[in-house]
Amino acid sequence: RVRSEFVLRASHELRTPVTGMHMAFGLFRERAKFPAESREADLLDTVNEEMQRLMQLINDLLNFSRYQNGLQKLTLGPCDVTDLLENARGRFTELANAQDIELLVEAQSELPRLYADQVQLERVLDNLLGNALRHTANGGQIRLQARRHGERVIISVEDNGEGIAYGQQGRIFEPFVQVGRKKGGAGLGLALCKEIVQLHGGRMGVYSRPGQGTQFYMALPL
């Protein structure tokens, strides 16, 4: 509990100065006049990418700590599941096209609406789609699926990428754990997803076979 409160406070205190630094650097970058292929331009691009990663890390720490400390509240309302998936596909279409990856939406007809925080569920889907794109080879396929199962709706993101080793699957939702060969972020994304789904009264899980792909799913109550 003490550690969670410390992380929350530290993340909050870090965000303001780092945001200011990022804005100041962005202004400098706009005004700097270096040839596009120069070493200086490459260095500016590298600094910009690393500052964006730092901002993402701080935001992930802050958001995760808010959930851990019970400070995050949901803004609940009617949520159309098919629209949720279609909008998620739209946000990632450009990235998928750049990798020649097909994004499919497969939603059961006449799904009932969820009573949920749509913004938070979008955050979960964005994280899962980002992971799927990172671990799927060019020319692959990712499916966004939804179906009703009793009094729950099962939403899943399934890819035909590299899969996850069996020995890593048990810890995949723990904070600061990264799996697979391609690392990214601080390993907080899936832990945050699990917190969001649990706050909705749902549960989250994973099915994966190494070399054959991965399916992350969330089971949300109606």
PLM segments and residue spans:
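Conserved catalytic submotifs in the C-terminal HATPase_c
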Residues: 75-80, 97, 102-112
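Short helix N-cap motif at coil->helix boundaries in the Bergerat
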Residues: 81, 163-171
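Helix-loop junction within the histidine kinase core
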Residues: 65-76
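Short alpha-helical Gxxx[C/S/T] motif in the catalytic ATP-binding
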Residues: 189, 193
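Short alpha-helical segment of the dimerization/phosphotransfer core of two-component systems
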Residues: 49-54
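Primarily the dimerization/phosphotransfer
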Residues: 1-33
